[in-house]
């Protein structure tokens, strides 16, 4: 990261949004290693989810990143935190022109786009407690899934 980026409010090259149970010890660890070797500063929240609200520091990290990389995995939508991160990422894409890159890791992009399979199940389960947030999450999932990205089945 160069000094110009720091002056312009950018603190991280990449913010990575992921569901830890699906990706932390495999795909994500390999990705982080490769990014470090290329001296790319990636913000990865390693703390376990706790509480109802995402921390202000995490929301700030999203806003202060040049790129957001969303790793959509089978259980991504089961996490309220992941969905709230996604909403913030989409807002940054629209307002700050942040670059957003979706990666579909062991999940089909159409399941994310149309909220089928595990995505549909997760949103149905969330509807019981977060009825007012589910339409916002659905919209963010659809918008992100329509972006150009990478599908892991293309690289196996």
Across the structure, where does each feature detected by a protein language model lie?
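Conserved N-terminal substructure of TIR/SEFIR domains
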Residues: 1-67
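Cross-kingdom TIR/SEFIR domain
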Residues: 33-38, 54-156
């Amino acid at each position: 990261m160069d000094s110009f980026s720091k002056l312009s409010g950018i603190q991280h090259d990449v913010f990575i949004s992921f569901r830890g149970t699906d990706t932390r010890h495999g795909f994500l660890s390999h990705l982080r290693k490769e990014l470090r070797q290329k001296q790319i500063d990636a913000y990865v929240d390693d703390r376990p989810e706790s509480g109802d609200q995402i921390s202000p520091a995490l929301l700030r990290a999203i806003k202060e990143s040049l790129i957001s990389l969303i790793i959509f995995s089978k259980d991504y939508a089961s996490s309220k935190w992941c969905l709230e991160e996604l909403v913030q990422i989409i807002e940054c894409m629209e307002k700050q022109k942040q670059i957003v890159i979706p990666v579909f890791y062991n999940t089909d992009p159409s399941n994310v786009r149309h909220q089928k399979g595990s995505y549909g199940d997760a949103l149905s389960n969330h509807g019981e407690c977060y009825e007012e947030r589910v339409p916002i999450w659905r919209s963010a999932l659809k918008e992100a899934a329509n972006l150009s990205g990478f599908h892991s089945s293309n690289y196996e």
